[in-house]
Amino acid sequence: MADSTADATETNADTLTLRRELKKVLTENLNDGGVKDRVETVKSIDEAIRILNRLKIVESKKRKRESDSSSVEVPKEFKCTLSKTIMIDPVIIFSGQTYEKRYITEWLNHDLTCPTAKQVLYRVCLTPNHLINELITRWCLANKYDRPAPKPSDIDYVTELFTDGIESLLQRISSPSSSVADQTEAAKELALQTEKFVNVRDFFIKELPDSITRLLTPLSVLGDEVDSNPELQENIVTALFNMSTFEKNKTVLAENHQVIPLLAKSMKQGSVVTRRNATLTLASLSDIDSNKIIIGNSVALKALIDLIGELDDLSATHDALCAVIDLCCDERENWKKAISLGLAPAAIKNIKARRNLFESLAALALISPHERVIQEVANLGVIYDLLSILRKTSCMVTCENAVVIVGNMYAKSRERSIKKILAEEENQHKTFTKIATQGSVVAVMKAQGILQCINY
């Protein structure tokens, strides 16, 4: 019994290779303009025919396997409930359910509930399910089932450029004489290079003179119209993000006076990918303590908080919340600025919508000791949302953050109605008694404190 899945992968690779060869031969003939002699032309035609015949054989084998496979019933456990087809790249989400990566990613861009369990997902985390993948592979081999191979991405074809090749890309991006199309193509190649090769991330910043400023030149000259060439902007911001993941680059990038303002603009103006990668870059740069001060003193902090309050893009909002939490942890000045810039109302907006709940509660809990935040929490009527979350959540961290906010509300709010609301919650649902017996250490302390106060 031949390895059906391996054969399928080989067939797909053969098809791609043959199509590239055919395109090359045809392009050479079309571009030749009749310069070649007749013998060379005939050879080229023969080569094209050979490739076409080979392609026909490969495609017919593929169709036969697909026909054979169609008669075998795939176990429902191996099918994605979203696509109704066999899983190629199975991943586990926060609820413990497994889905095809492509389809669950698309789902989570619009809805943060589990498609099967219907529960709110407190974290957007996709973990490869190696066990189910191995089981599917074995079943396919045993049943001679042709499981589709994952579609190759652009990065699968990238080979590492030498130093002069990277310099050439930068020259094409930064040169005033380059067309937008050429700049875009060069920026895309640089984004792929920096994604795949750590050496390129290191070399670009360390060895190329004024490389960051030159990379940003096409966007800097556009000013407020930074998104007028969206594909170019996306590729440049993506390259920046890739380079920011290299530890030695973080400080250099943050200290360049053009980088953070550009990222702030790109969070407001740009494609979905651009906005998300700009946010991820700021989150990456905030790993360094000195960078937290730089970012906190810039327009980027407000841009992050504005993005949190928009609710348009779940992934970007999630990343912005994570970035703000990182910036405010152990950095009191950023904490104060975030409060004055409206972090509490932005986080509450997410909590009320039950979107990015895990991160929104973490952000609000972080700043909840401040009196202004307590007043905003009271004014926006989020207490009932918090109590509902406490009753329903099975996540200990979410429970801890929610009860911390409630505890701070009770301790600092001047509203007498808070005590009455909490007492009614305890009488009807025993919410705080349950937390006091089965929550985290911090949650237990807060719940016990609330119980003492409402029973006093």
Swiss-Prot record:
Organism of this sequence: Arabidopsis thaliana (Mouse-ear cress)
Matching SUPFAM superfamilies: ARM repeat, RING/U-box
Any one Gene Ontology molecular-function term assigned to this protein's record: ubiquitin protein ligase activity
Disulphide-bonded residues: none
Name of this chain's protein: U-box domain-containing protein 48
Gene: PUB48
Function as written in the Swiss-Prot or TrEMBL entry: Functions as an E3 ubiquitin ligase.
U-box domain mapped to chain residues: 73-146
Start and stop residues of the ARM repeats: 247-287, 289-329
Pfam families per record: U-box (PF04564)
Top enzyme category: transferase
One GO biological process term: regulation of cellular response to heat
Domain of life: Eukaryota
Gene3D superfamilies given in the database record: Leucine-rich Repeat Variant (1.25.10.10), Zinc/RING finger domain, C3HC4 (zinc finger) (3.30.40.10)
